[in-house]
Amino acid sequence: MLSCDGTFLLLHTLKSGSKDGIIQFEKLEFDKDVIFMKLENAELKNIERIVAISKAAFDSDIDVGASEPGGPPDYDSIAWHIQMKNEGHLLQAVIDGEIVGGAILFLEKDGEILYIGRIFIDPIHHRKGYGLSLMKMVEAYYSGVKTIKLDTPLWNVRTNAFYTKLGYCEVRRDQEFAYYQKELKSVFEVNGCLAKLS
């Protein structure tokens, strides 16, 4: 949720019986079933940690179809991540003061399209709902865009299923990648704050 003071916080409940992926805007009592994740511009002092998470996350793809450890171009490059930070594309995902992941995002066509270059969560936090929370935060943070686009390798069964679960539709594929997109609903302003129509 984006408050009028610029604070951005998503409360995503994982309690059984709740609707998966629903953003809870009311205050929730803190317990082990609630994720409090903050999405913010990456800080230079955190680049080494972010790169270590990126490397670990993409290297873990060997468990879901990759032929060997590795990732997209520059996934393990400190210099490239610094460049992405300096250009405003690199965000860090933080829970309880700990960086747990990141996202590299690009606005296109005068802010109408968001291209998700990559998202990544530290493998020690896989299967905890952090990736789902990160994607929901990206969608809420960029709620003014009309379309979100991304791509993922065909061999990666984990990410293809994940994006489909989140409502992304495959629009095409080539020999290496599946290309997905999602159309977002309208946004309106209430008391100077953005709110998404449901």
Residue map of PLM features:
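Conserved GNAT acetyl-CoA-binding A-motif
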Residues: 135, 142-154
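Conserved beta-strand in the GNAT
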Residues: 92, 98-107, 115, 120
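A short helix-loop-beta-strand connector motif used in the catalytic cores of GNAT acetyltransferases and
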Residues: 79-92
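Conserved active-site alpha-helix within GNAT-family acetyltransferase domains
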Residues: 132-133, 154-173
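Conserved GNAT-fold acetyl-CoA-binding loop/helix
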Residues: 55-80
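Conserved beta-strand-loop-alpha-helix junction that forms the acyl-donor binding cleft
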Residues: 126, 149-160, 176-177
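Conserved acetyl-CoA pyrophosphate-binding loop and the N-cap/start of the following alpha-helix
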Residues: 125, 129-137
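A short beta-loop-alpha structural element at the N-terminal edge
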Residues: 37-52
